[in-house]
Amino acid sequence: MNAVTETAATTTDMPLPFVFTDAAADKVKQLIDEEGNPDLKLRVFVQGGGCSGFQYGFTFDEEVNEDDTVMNKNGVQLLIDSMSYQYLVGAEIDYKDDLNGAQFVIKNPNATTTCGCGSSFSV
């Protein structure tokens, strides 16, 4: 398990591998509180599929796997497995609630193309 914290950039002068926004962390915390299970963590992953080749996935998980990278933010944990990590380096994981609806969104600088809905991409 690789642990990443908000203070990693200031203590090691290394950039964080991805950004987990306050809005996303706060929404995850709200959803975990609604579930009543404080052991839940948000797992973000990449899998084959979608109209552009890869698609993002979000799920809650109680387990931290040996190859997971863990980011702690505002009292919640974000998990990314080692295969997905390579596609998410530099990405911003955010939560938006606007006229288009409420959803988690990923801004990924590694994506060369994305589909219209933003849920799939290619590299």
Swiss-Prot record:
One Pfam short name: Fe-S_biosyn
Summary of subunit composition and partner proteins: Homodimer.
Annotated GO MF terms: 2 iron, 2 sulfur cluster binding; 4 iron, 4 sulfur cluster binding; iron ion binding
Disulfide bond entries: none
Cofactor field: iron-sulfur cluster
Cofactor stoichiometry and binding remark: Binds 1 iron-sulfur cluster per subunit.
InterPro entries xref list: FeS_biogenesis (IPR000361), FeS_cluster_insertion (IPR016092), FeS_cluster_insertion_CS (IPR017870), FeS_cluster_insertion_RrpA (IPR023063), HesB-like_dom_sf (IPR035903)
Domain of life: Bacteria
Residue numbers binding iron-sulfur cluster: 51, 115, 117
The family this protein is said to belong to: Belongs to the HesB/IscA family.
Function: Required for insertion of 4Fe-4S clusters.
Name of this chain's protein: Putative iron-sulfur cluster insertion protein ErpA
GO biological process, any: iron-sulfur cluster assembly
Alphabetical keyword list: Iron, Iron-sulfur, Metal-binding
